[in-house]
């Protein structure tokens, strides 16, 4: 099996735009509410829930920690809904995404999310399951429920991708 190394990039709205939304207050529209006592950072992600009898779900995922090197052997996507991950412990995490290549994901890209950033994967975006760093971490996850199966998995057979370091280049 051939192994190709991925370089970790810093997570920015511009770099992540083809895959979804970076959830952060920086650059967000600010609205004062509750008689000016609360700052509301408005409309941070595009939540999608398509299909039959759908609704948004709010979950907490507890991710086990990963240490480098990390081998990316598979990816998944959700054809009927977006999926958002917002860290609750303020710890950084890795985000691995790929464009669609027709028969599966294209070459993945790896991003390092700060502990004050979340991500929202748009529908049909290939991504690796949760990659918490440092220690076990909790994430608020906004997901989709509905009748249709909302999970497709792809396992790389000819080669894998490796993240040698969790630091950005």
Curated annotation (Swiss-Prot):
Its EC number is 4.3.2.3. InterPro entries: RmlC_Cupin_sf (IPR011051), UAH_cupin (IPR047233), Ureidogly_lyase (IPR007247), Ureidogly_lyase_bac (IPR023525), Ureidoglycolate_lyase_dom_sf (IPR024060). It is an enzyme of class 4 (lyase). Its cofactor is Ni(2+). Keywords: Lyase, Purine metabolism. One of its GO terms (biological process) is allantoin catabolic process. GO terms for molecular function: ureidoglycolate hydrolase activity; ureidoglycolate lyase activity. It comes from the Bacteria. Coiled coil: none annotated. HAMAP family: Ureidogly_lyase. Catalyzes the catabolism of the allantoin degradation intermediate (S)-ureidoglycolate, generating urea and glyoxylate. Involved in the utilization of allantoin as nitrogen source. This is Ureidoglycolate lyase. It comes from Brucella melitensis biotype 2 (strain ATCC 23457).
